[in-house]
Each structure stands twice: as structure tokens, then as C-alpha cells.
A protein has these predicted regions:
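Glycan-recognition/cleft segments
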Residues: 128-165, 224
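Extracellular, beta-strand-rich glycan-interacting domains
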Residues: 45-52, 109-119, 239, 243, ...
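Short, aromatic/His-centered strand-loop micro-motif at the edge of beta-sheets
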Residues: 161-190
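Extracytoplasmic low-complexity segments
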Residues: 20-91, 235, 281-288
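C-terminal motif of bacterial Sec signal peptides marking the signal peptidase cleavage site
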Residues: 15-19
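Short tryptophan-centered beta-strand motifs in secreted/extracellular beta-sheet-rich domains
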Residues: 113, 186-195, 204
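Short surface loop/edge beta-strand patches of beta-sandwich-type extracellular domains
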Residues: 29-38, 90-109, 175-181
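Flexible glycan-contacting loops in extracellular carbohydrate-active proteins
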Residues: 215-263
Length: 288
């Protein structure tokens, strides 16, 4: 009977140890998380690309969102770390995230970042995307830079923004309205896109200064023939820096001409407010 009892105890210990081993989880931050963080300031998502902490030595952790501290997915092997505007930056492709925290619920917003690139040749390159689970584009808001044959030069860039899951509104910097500022001269430049729900207008900033004199089809955001009011992103999912929805595996068009950003990205910020001109200038002047 003692032998039988001892055997039962031994089996119980082995099962307990085995159960503990099976339930062991990887350390926090080992993989991208699949739930959202609710930030406490208007800055809802922020990727500085420059952590030098030993625990962030893996590239996906260096490229983490510093608000939630969650890493990105591992980027493609061609994505590298380069010298940025403050410390290090990302170069060469897309960086994908499970989400942008709760930024997709914003009613006013600001997208701000630093970029460095030459003129795309042959195909457009994507700047960023807030993907969606719906619509033929599978994206709520995205922006890209056209290639040389489409009119981009080192001094004036053809930039296009698409708002809405069914490409409801196109905001196209083309012809006489190409975006100035030497954005494609292979130097770092700061861009900010600011939407204010009280005016239903979007303001564009290049190197801390607002672009003025733009036609209404570049500034006025509409819905059903009237002002948009609060921004309305539909079923947002994930976020892609330097790519469209396809680069993050979120569906949408899969054509080969849809290319990731092949230059540099740094200090990528998403706010749930319309930053003022003074606040945008401060980001530029402080290299934030």
C-alpha cells in the first residue's frame, strides 16, 4: 500500500511539473501583442526607432511602439537600422504592428514623421497605412509617393493620400500642386498631416511650416456631399509604417507595383488631436 501511495505521489509530481512546463509563457514583449493599450496623453502611438537598451537589441523590439512597449513584427531582412535625425532610424521597407493602440478611434488626428529618400523609379512607394477589415482597399487612411515618370522630382513630390475603405476621397498633390520642400533629395525632412474635425479640413506641414494656398480638393474632407466632421475610420486593424495593407498581410490590392518605402523613417507619431502650428514647428525644431 505504501508503494502504491508513493507511486501516486510521484505521478502527481511529474504531472504537475509537466503542466507547469506546458503553461510557461515567453517573456513580455517577445511577440507582438494582440490587444490594445489606452494611452493617457494625445500621443497614442510613437515609434522612435532608436532604443539602445540591451533588452531591445532585437530589431523588432528596437522598432517597438514606445507607448505600449509592444514590438513590431520582425521586418524583412532588407530592413536596416541607419543614422536618424536624433539617434537611429529605420531604412529599407515596411514595419508592421498589430495595432496603433486606440488611434483608429480618433475624431481629429495628426500623423507626423521624418522621412529620407530619393525619387522612386518605376513604381510608387508607400509611407504609411491604417488598415481596415472592410472595403476593397482594406485601408482607412494611407499615403504614398509617386515615381519619377508620374512627376516626382527631388524638389517637388507627387504625394497621394487615400481616405476611406472604398477610396472615398483622394487627396492628390499633382501638377502645379506637387508637394514642395525637396522631400526626395535624400536628406531628412519632417512631414505632418493634421485633421481638425471642427473645420473638416486637413493641413499639411513640411519641415515645420504649413502649406498654404492649396485648393479645396486637397484640404476639405467630405462625406455625402458635406463636411466630414469627426473622422470616421471603419474597423481599423493593425498599422503599417512604410507600406500599404498588403505589406502587413491585411488584404487589399496585391499588385507588384505597390512598393514599400525604400528610404528612411524616423520618429513616427500618431496623435488623437489636431496639433497646432506651434506644436508641429516644435516637433521639427526639436527633431522629434
Amino acid at each position: 500500500m505504501k508503494i502504491f501511495s508513493g507511486s501516486l505521489i510521484l505521478i502527481g509530481v511529474i504531472l504537475a511539473i509537466g503542466g507547469c512546463q506546458k503553461m510557461k509563457r515567453p517573456p513580455l514583449g517577445e511577440y507582438p501583442q494582440d490587444y490594445t493599450t489606452t494611452p493617457t496623453t494625445p500621443l497614442r502611438f510613437y515609434v522612435p526607432f532608436d532604443s539602445s537598451k540591451p533588452e531591445h537589441s532585437q530589431i523588432n523590439k528596437r522598432f517597438r511602439d514606445s507607448i505600449s512597449d509592444y514590438p513590431s513584427f520582425f521586418p524583412a531582412s532588407n530592413v536596416k537600422v541607419i543614422q536618424g535625425v536624433r539617434a537611429t532610424a529605420e531604412f529599407g521597407g515596411s514595419v508592421v504592428y498589430n495595432n496603433a493602440n486606440d488611434w483608429g478611434q480618433s475624431t481629429s488626428f495628426t500623423v507626423a514623421f521624418w522621412e529620407k529618400n530619393t525619387v522612386p523609379v518605376g513604381e510608387p512607394q508607400w509611407l504609411f497605412t491604417l488598415p481596415s477589415k472592410d472595403g476593397w482597399t482594406n485601408s482607412n487612411f494611407t499615403a504614398y509617393v509617386e515615381h519619377q515618370a508620374a512627376g516626382s522630382t527631388s524638389t517637388d513630390a507627387v504625394i497621394k493620400l487615400i481616405w476611406g475603405v472604398d477610396a472615398d476621397q483622394w487627396l492628390e498633390f499633382v501638377g502645379p500642386n506637387k508637394m514642395p520642400g525637396n522631400l526626395l533629395n535624400n536628406q531628412w525632412h519632417h512631414l505632418a498631416f493634421v485633421y481638425d474635425q471642427t473645420t473638416s479640413k486637413i493641413t499639411y506641414y513640411v519641415d515645420g511650416a504649413a502649406l498654404t494656398g492649396l485648393p479645396s480638393n486637397l484640404t476639405d474632407i467630405t462625406k455625402n456631399g458635406g463636411p466630414m466632421g469627426p473622422a470616421q475610420f471603419k474597423t481599423p486593424t493593425g498599422f503599417v509604417i512604410g507600406g500599404w495593407s498588403k505589406h502587413g498581410g491585411f488584404g487589399g490590392a496585391q499588385d507588384s507595383w505597390i512598393q514599400p518605402w525604400k528610404g528612411g523613417m524616423d520618429q513616427f507619431r500618431l496623435y488623437n488631436k489636431a496639433l497646432s502650428a506651434t506644436e508641429v514647428a516644435a516637433l521639427y525644431n526639436s527633431k522629434l
